[in-house]
Amino acid sequence: MTAPIVADTNHDMELNCRFDMESEELYAVKWYKDDHEFFRYMPHQQPHIMAFPVSGVHLALQGTDCDEIHCKVQLTKLTRHHSDGAYRCEVSSEAPTFRLAAETHNITVATLPKEKPAIVGLVETYNEGDMLSATCTSSPSDPAAIVTWFINNQQIDTKYLEIEKMECYIIAAAGGELRQTLYV
């Protein structure tokens, strides 16, 4: 099974399940979120595909593709608090063996920043010992981005940071996402 560790609410999420039935015949592929079935593919029944309502799961049927060796589902309209969870692909074979194999991936859903953070207040060069005063603002995200400072690709130890103030506020027009500003 392939699935993202973190899925972005700004994009659809794709889940893939590949399997080798060897000499056995595929009976069904089922997809679950938190032990609730939301999708079923059964190649020998009509209809082949069945979808079931599960909170936080919205299937994009045009992104679904299943056959005898793989099953891909595409989920859309992800939300952080409802689409997070344990996603499982379960594959079963026909009689007489009725073998069952499953794999689960925990997926975190977040709204990732669409842009790089903006830093203002810097000058072109600094000499050793100079004081640096700058402001870093992240673009909206949920949860709020964690601001980490680097100089010459080296992370700055927080004991050398004097944080003047930090603001974290909700941008209602952006769907309740958070923007963080750090003044140092």
Spans of features found by a protein language model:
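Short beta-strand segments of immunoglobulin-like
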Residues: 1-8, 120-126, 138-139
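Structural beta-strand segments of beta-rich domains
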Residues: 11-15, 130-134
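Ligand-binding face of N-terminal immunoglobulin V-set domains in extracellular IgSF glycoproteins
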Residues: 12, 16-18, 28, 58-106
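N-terminal V-set
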Residues: 22-58, 142-163
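Flexible inter-domain hinge/linker segments at boundaries of tandem extracellular adhesion modules
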Residues: 1, 32-37, 104-122, 151-157
